[in-house]
Amino acid sequence: IQELGLPERSEQECLTMIGLRLTEAPAKLFPELDLEPDLYALTYRRLFNEYNVEGAVELYPNVVETLTALKDRGLVLTIASSRSNASLNAYIENLGLSHIITYVLGGNDVQEGKPHPEAVNRTLRELGFQPEEAIVVGDTVFDIHMGRNAGTKTCGVTYGNGSGESLADADWLID
């Protein structure tokens, strides 16, 4: 925001954009301005690559153990993210999740971003599942709406970017 000389926004306002594509966030964050979304996205990616170092993102406690237990019980675990494929796959590898996650769909793989159901629908189709056999777990309202729009059950996790209030539309909440 500073790099582009845009009006200051609060941390809370910026956090509400997490989950949206970088090309969609500017119009929501700065509706009064006529911004070039590609310039915003390119600037964000440049700064992200400059400041994002291995170890900058940490998993919450017990995540690997929980996901491993779910996989051991026969659940198929996938990730659909608006994050670029390159950074998403790097995170999965660096965080030691590669052996747990069956299928990964990044923002580059879909035409429509969250909350559109394209990512969920494509994942279900690729893996041969029906919506009623799936649960979308997420920490933003966009994740929950994506799951709802795809006809799946949804589970909001409040220890990420969302609050119980913002995730109230989820079928279940985990604190």
Give the label of every model feature segment.
Residues 69, 73-76, 102-103, 133, ...:
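Structural signature of beta-strand start/N-cap positions in the alpha/beta core
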Residues 81-83:
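Conserved phosphate-coupling serine/threonine residues in phosphotransfer and NTP-handling enzymes
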Residues 113-144:
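Conserved Lys-Pro-Asp/Glu-containing loop-to-beta segment of HAD-superfamily phosphomonoesterases
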Residues 135-173:
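Acidic, Mg2+-coordinating phosphoryl-transfer loop and its flanking beta/alpha structural elements
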